Amino acid sequence: MENLLRPIYQERASHPNTLAVIMIERRNKTSSLTDNFDAALLVIVKDADEPVFIKHYEFDHQTASLHVVTDSQIQEWILLGTNRRIIDWIVNGRVLFDRNEYVVELIDRLNTFPFAERKLKIGLEYGKLIRRYVEGKAFFEANQFLDAYNAVVHALHHLARIEVIDRGFHPETTVWSQVRQMEPQVYKLYSELIESHESLEKRLELLFLANDFLIHSKAEIGSAHLFEVMKEKDIWQFGELLQHHDLKHFTQDLGVMLDYLTEKGLINVCQIETKGQAVYHRGYSFKKGVDSDS
């Protein structure tokens, strides 16, 4: 396969804009890692008009895909976890070209997993966990048990990823095999939801009780990034938090996250006067003493 792709990747490698070329070969008959192509070629570049550019090839009854991706897009995928297979590609792919040890340094950073990045990723997962939990509970109370089940499964996935990240690892596409070793309690919850012979309603009822406890127990690490921002000044309006540079990735889940933390008494709320009579802006402030740094 490499010989067939050589003209493609050598032409790309000759560009000064190219940082690395990595080949990922199909491992199984069904391969989500390569979208069922026989191989995927990842070309990482400094910059481009489009952050992601993809081409498909066919030759000698074999198929391959070419992915030209900017360095900034790679960093965003790693940070936000929005393309989980990218880590597998980088760590397990075959490096065909590596300018100035770009891939070596990238893998070293993945292995080191700086604390600030872990804190941000945990915060993002925590917001998604709360979102799915609230959605699931709403479905459950409306007797929409299948939709509630779907939401709870997603919530457990976010909880699983928090456990993995908190231990200094990046969540893999097979996150449950990681969690089984790292946090058997969370793995057991997932197994009971999937395998229990109880009625779906009963399974969900028990899961919501357990989830409520676990979400609250993760509040300190899950909110650490948000609390760090909120310490910058005494009172915040929601729009101010939303526009803060360090919270730009929280936009979708920040509202539900603040509501949950307020309900649990971890954030203070105050009223800020408006021009309207008896109408107030809601102000949020960090409640001192809720984290270990205070």
From Swiss-Prot:
Gene source species: Bacillus subtilis (strain 168)
InterPro entries: NT_sf, NTF-like, WH-like_DNA-bd_sf, YgxA-like_substrate-bd, YgxA_HTH
Protein name: Uncharacterized protein YgxA
Cystine pairs: none
One Pfam family of this chain: YgxA-like_sub_bind
